[in-house]
Each structure stands twice: as structure tokens, then as C-alpha cells.
Amino acid sequence: MRQAIFIGAAGFVGAILRFFVSSAVAFAAPRNFPYGTLTVNVSGCFLLAAFLTLFRERAAADGLRLAIAVGFLGAYTTFSTFAQEIYDLGKAQRILAAIGYAALSLALGLTAVWAGVRIAHFIEKY
């Protein structure tokens, strides 16, 4: 039960941060593309990869790992909004934008995971 409370508390923080980051990016960027969701999902990929790499072999950190990975980053990132935005772009007859958004999200997400792992390995060295 205690673990569920930590996951929920971390999820609350992740959801609030997603709202602020996505809103700030959407305010600053053109409104014709889902830049806010792209930003939170790509940054979430980076953070999850770095965090899991740094804490992969620390058994004492299992509770922290769940709170951050499942709670905080699970609430911070959003696959359902990503899918809905692709659908909305397609429904608006913006097929190339929908395909581009999906491809860009995947490419940047995988690049962010790679960068997160590399930076975590660099941190571990020093």
C-alpha cells in the first residue's frame, strides 16, 4: 500500500509538470502542430532511459524506481494524447502532418533514449 501511495504522489507531480511544460510549449510554438506533447514525450524518453540506466542495479532503489518510472514519468508522458493528436490531424485531412508527427515522435524518442543511456553511462564513469 505504501508503494502505491508513493507511485500516486509521484504521478501527481508528473501530471502537473506535464501540464505546465506542454502548456508553455504550446503557448510559445505555432498552434498547428502538437509540439507540447512531442516535447513531454521526448523529454520523458530521455529521463526514463537515464534514470533506469543509473538505477538498474540498485536493489534498495526498487521503490524509488517504481515511483519515478511508473508514477512520475508514467504521468508525465502521454501515449493516449499522442495517438489522439495523430487521429485529429488525419481527421483534419492533414495526413502528411499525422505521418510526420508519428515518425518524428518515434525518431526523436529513440534518439532521446539513446542519449539518456549514453549520458547515464558517462555520469557513472565519474
Identify the residue ranges that each predicted region occupies.
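Membrane-interface helix-loop junctions in multi-pass transporters/channels
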Residues: 1-126
